[in-house]
């Protein structure tokens, strides 16, 4: 995984942009809070449903949008290294093998359980099903059940499940086949003059029409099968024409849609993951998005606590999303009561929060 400084160095070398005088904004929020909807409204891309999102799937690769005068449309995607992708696949296969073994201990024979473990990681950050065909996943789940399970079924614990040399051989073949499926899916994306895993940024440019540019990005970065998001480490999308019509035409900014809060249990419980703090340092403002009906609970409240404790409170602004879901006639009063409840909760953590 690339460090934040490495990412910025690569992007600077690729674009040669001077962003020193432009306001930089970091979007933060729990899964389903409405960050992606906010980005769509700022970019004027609602009719294209871009960026794509679902109710339960959160942003994985941080995506940076740059709006600047005289800037042509361009997308730069930094991809993960081959070994990192391979290791992530191996972790999924290991979990699928352990699930097959667990099921065998309670006389449960469920191929779907094994396949589900292959589809994506528990935290949702690595979704193999975005680049591996359904029939391949089912076939490899079957290999685990029919070829590996008989070799490990009698084990008393799962610590040594994968030590058997025959198990290792079959497992490595499964990983190899899954990896090849990823490569084949990538080839079908029709990206000219680019070799996967050669260490260079993937660049989409020379598209002058906003609709064509957005649709090409949507094709590559969608949330379902045929997307390359699985491989993406960081994404930069730039262009003067990205701005929605309702915003001032001379507006310039960098907007970073960060990973959603709540990928890890610790983040849901109390503190923010350290991956956010580089962005806090880099950006001028932190916009924390929360659903109006239940704002800033769980991970959201923990995020506010972490921001205050670590001295970033001067950068923090709160945004209520999905206000159309409020049935109360006095929406302002409703939201103020919600904030008052948040203030009371933070006081218990000895954090002074002014509404």
Go through each PLM region and give its residues.
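Globular "head" domains of long coiled-coil molecular machines
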Residues: 17-355
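N-terminal pre-Walker A segment at the start of P-loop NTPase domains
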Residues: 1-19
């Amino acid at each position: 995984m690339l460090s934040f400084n490495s990412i910025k160095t690569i992007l600077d070398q690729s674009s040669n942009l001077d962003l020193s005088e432009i306001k930089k904004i970091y979007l933060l929020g729990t899964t389903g809070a409405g960050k992606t909807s906010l980005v769509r409204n700022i970019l004027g891309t609602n009719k294209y449903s871009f960026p794509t999102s679902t109710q339960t799937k959160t942003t994985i690769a941080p995506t940076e949008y740059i709006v600047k005068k005289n800037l042509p449309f361009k997308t730069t995607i930094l991809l993960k290294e081959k070994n990192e992708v391979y290791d992530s696949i191996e972790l999924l296969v290991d979990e699928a093998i352990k699930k097959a073994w667990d099921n065998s201990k309670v006389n449960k024979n469920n191929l779907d359980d094994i396949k589900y473990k292959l589809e994506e990681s528990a935290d949702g950050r690595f979704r193999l099903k975005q680049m591996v065909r359904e029939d391949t996943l089912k076939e490899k789940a079957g290999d685990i059940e029919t070829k590996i399970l008989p070799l490990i079924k009698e084990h008393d614990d799962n610590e040594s499940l994968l030590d058997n040399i025959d198990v290792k051989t079959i497992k490595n073949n499964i990983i190899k086949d899954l990896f090849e499926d990823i490569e084949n899916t990538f080839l079908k994306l029709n990206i000219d003059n680019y070799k996967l895993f050669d260490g260079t940024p993937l660049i989409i440019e020379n598209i002058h029409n906003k609709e064509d540019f957005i649709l090409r990005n949507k094709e590559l970065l969608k949330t379902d099968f045929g997307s390359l998001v699985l491989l993406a480490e960081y994404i930069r999308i730039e262009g003067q024409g990205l701005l929605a019509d309702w915003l001032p035409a001379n507006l310039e900014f960098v907007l970073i849609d960060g990973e959603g809060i709540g990928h890890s249990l610790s983040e849901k419980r109390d503190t923010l993951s350290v991956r956010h703090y580089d962005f806090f340092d880099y950006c001028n403002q932190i916009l924390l998005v929360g659903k109006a009906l239940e704002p800033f609970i769980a991970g959201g409240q923990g995020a506010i606590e972490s921001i205050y404790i670590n001295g970033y409170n001067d950068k923090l602004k709160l945004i209520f999303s999905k206000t159309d879901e409020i049935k109360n006639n006095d929406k302002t009063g409703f939201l103020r009561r919600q904030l008052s409840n948040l203030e009371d909760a933070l006081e218990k953590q000895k954090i002074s929060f002014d509404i």
